[in-house]
Structure formats: C-alpha cells, structure tokens
C-alpha cells in the first residue's frame, strides 16, 4: 500500500541511508540499511503474517533477506544518485506491483513453485543480487568519498 511504502522509504532511504553515508562507505550503507530493512519484516514472517507457508521459515528468511538487501542496494544507489527519496518510493511501489500483481500471478504453479516465486523464493533473490552487484560496483566508485565529507 502507498502509505506503508511511503513510510518505509522515508525511514530507510529518506533518513537512514543519507545518515549512514556520512559515517561509512557505500558498502557499509547498503549492508546496514539492507539488513535492517530485512529484519524489520522478520517478525511478520515469524508470526506467519507475511511469507510463503509452503517453504520452511529458514528458506523464506534467507531468500527474503537476500532479495531485500539486494533491492535495498539498488534503491540506496538511486537515492544517493538523485538526492531524492521519491525515486526509491517509485522503485519500491513498482517492485511490489510487479512481484505481487504480475510475476507471481502469471507463474505456472507446481509442487516446487513456492521455492522460486515471489519475495521468498530463489529466482527473484538471485536476479536481484546480480543486478545489485552492478549497482554496488557503480556506487563504490561514484560514492567513494561519502564518509569523508564530514
């Protein structure tokens, strides 16, 4: 939903990412913000309110954390590059729509589908990791002096 996306992005990319960029490298920014953003969702996964009940909780946590940290890397890059939280809000919203309303519904389901679809499966996490690696490399080069500004 728009209010929850906006709330998350104001907190994670609007406040946390710029503050972290004052004290650590781009690598530090993406690791800390990505893991914290993932951990923010973990209670809902543990309680069974968010996730995929067909796979183990450990599988869900691993791939969700990998996906969110990777996606957070891309969003931190665009946030710092544009100096605007709105780019992260738009990315987050588009990502949610694609995953929840397009990718998962059009996937042919079988007994193994739960292991590869949506935010809790392997496919999106692995694809996001490959894309995030490219953004991480760009970020390391472009924002090499982040923590040195203060």
What are these model-predicted stretches?
Residues 37-44, 71, 75, 99, ...:
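Alpha-helical transmembrane segments of multipass membrane proteins
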Residues 93-150:
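C-terminal membrane module of polytopic membrane proteins
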Residues 1-6, 38, 64-68:
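Residue-level hotspots within the lipid-embedded alpha helices of multi-pass solute transporters
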Residues 1-13, 17-23, 47-60, 109, ...:
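Juxtamembrane helix-loop-helix connectors linking adjacent transmembrane helices
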Residues 34-38, 93-96:
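Residue-level recognition of pore/gate-forming positions within transmembrane alpha-helices
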Residues 7-36, 80-84:
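Membrane-interface helix/loop boundary segments of multi-pass membrane proteins
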Residues 25-30, 60, 64, 68, ...:
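Residue-level signature of transmembrane alpha-helical entry/exit and packing/kink sites
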Residues 53-117:
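Functionally important transmembrane alpha-helices
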